[in-house]
Swiss-Prot record:
GO cellular component, one term: cytoplasm
Binding-site positions, Zn(2+): 24, 27, 40, 43
The name this protein goes by in its record: Small ribosomal subunit protein uS14
GO biological process: translation
SUPFAM superfamilies to which the protein is assigned, alphabetical: Glucocorticoid receptor-like (DNA-binding domain) (SSF57716)
Subunit record text: Part of the 30S ribosomal subunit. Contacts proteins S3 and S10.
Ribosomal protein is among the record's keywords: yes
Taxonomy, superkingdom: Bacteria
GO molecular function annotation: rRNA binding; structural constituent of ribosome; zinc ion binding
Similarity section: Belongs to the universal ribosomal protein uS14 family. Zinc-binding uS14 subfamily.
Source organism of this protein record: Halothermothrix orenii (strain H 168 / OCM 544 / DSM 9562)
Length: 61
């Protein structure tokens, strides 16, 4: 889990807009972030397998 200090720091508006860090809305992870869903890859995968993200299904070919 993400340290609380980093979560609070990410919520605060940065001095410059390029410093903004995208974080997962569910767990607060900064790496592997998917903008379209506001989730990290791990949370996205869990929710997709449960069928909780509309329009997303496992690829098969």
């Amino acid at each position: 889990m993400t340290r609380k200090a980093l979560m609070e720091k990410a919520k605060k508006e940065p001095k410059y807009s390029t410093r903004k860090v995208n974080r997962c809305k569910r767990c607060g992870r900064a790496r592997g972030y998917m903008r379209k869903f506001d989730l990290c890859r791990i949370c996205f995968r869990e929710l997709a397998h449960k069928g909780e993200i509309p329009g997303v299904k496992k690829a098969s070919w």
